[in-house]
Amino acid sequence: MQVTFKKIGHSLLAALMLMSFLLPLLSAGKTVHAATTTVDFTLHKIEQTSDEQIQNTGHDLGLTGRKPVQGAQFKIFNVTDAFYQLLENHDKTTAASMISQNLGQYVNLQDPGAAIVTTDADGLAAFKGLAAKTNGRHSVYAFHEAVTPQPYQKAADMIVSLPVRHDDGTDLTNIHLYPKDSLVTKNLTEINEQAVATKDLHDVAVGDVLTYQVQFQIPHDIGALADHSQDTFKYNQFKVLDYMTKEGLTFKALTAITVDGQDILKALTRKMVFMTSNDAAWQHTHNYPFGFELDFLGGVDPDAVRNLLTQYAGKRVTVAYTGIVNEKMVPDQKVGNTAEVSFDPDSKITVNGPEIQTGGIRFFKHEAGSSKSLANATFILQRMNANVREYAVLEGVNGMPGTYQPTKITWTTNQDAATKLKTSGAETANLTIQGLLPGRYTLVETAAPEGYEILDPTTDFEAIAGTWGTKTIRIANTPVNQLLPMTGGIGLFAFLMIGAILMGAVTS
């Protein structure tokens, strides 16, 4: 035991902080007023999304407004003998922490005879009629979360040493425990460095810079040795994979890895493996058009990374990154992304982030009174922004008329700087613009096709989500009023001759 304790010293130090909220459950030095032969335990599995520590007292804390976690399975093990053996060389806190860090070293976690209970719709799991004493000594129990529903992380193993008592010294016979259930989350937090509300779907424009955050908990035993091992660590894999299955986003940067108020990205740089969809090797590993992977323990110095993470064992970590909406995003197509956190090759925690979508608009420029397509009409796009008229500058367009898939849309008050949009000769929609935010705009015709005149230079419209494939706005031009034949024909000469003859007849 001495060797194992020495090996996990750094991890144990961090674990003691986590175990502190269990200290009230360790035996107090008060006089027992009445003998207790059996005890009941009620576990309250509730969602937690922060570093909040719920102080376990053994009493029902009456917590309300918390989301219960249904479907978690807990096993209970009697670790009395192991606990008292450790007490020969360690104090109670250290002994409890050692068992919590390496429970599989003291019990058979796959023991088919172990009692197992699944949390119900209220997040409760009850263990009834457990012996208060084992072999004449106060019993010590370990609670192990065997099955964890998605997208939650497994709670730390909890060690409870009986008796647990009321303030008056009498034994509690129904002990309430609150295992921490950390939720893996994925959120879009900013668009163009402006905070956005949490919701399931965000409207974006091409060129927008999106900031995402993936949050999860560093395992409380990240630095512990594997069960029954003197030199192999429990965790040899720690990966975060984030990806999109549809095109529309370009990875920009990993901006921060924050835990306990500290940004540890710089300390991890070049110690972990970091790959993005901008790297050539990405497509050989992941068949996704967008994403990144952080392999914390797969780099050149996994021990240094493990030691760093051990300092923050049990804390929530935030991985922040940015992506740019690109021209490949199809209007009205909802694009979501997924985060996966894995601590071993056989299991992963998966969470879906919010979806994003961009908009677009279709126009058909035609001859009035017919469906004849008119090419080479010229337009600019404008909008009103807080009573200021702005004009669209479409970046990255290929110069071909009719279809505009910009890499970015910026807005200027200088009309001369606006991008000139020309219609093609397409027989349906001959002017399309992609990557717009939903909203109100005005298309301004600045030049009609040759031989036609502008009826009304402005067309007000609203880009509405869900209408890209179904709505086309028609804009008509009328032919120029041609009273005289074109120069070079005989019509004008004949007209003048007839006029001269008629005039002569009048004067004769």
Task: Place the predicted regions along the sequence by residue.
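Solvent-exposed loop/turn and edge beta-strand elements of beta-rich ligand-binding domains
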Residues: 2-508
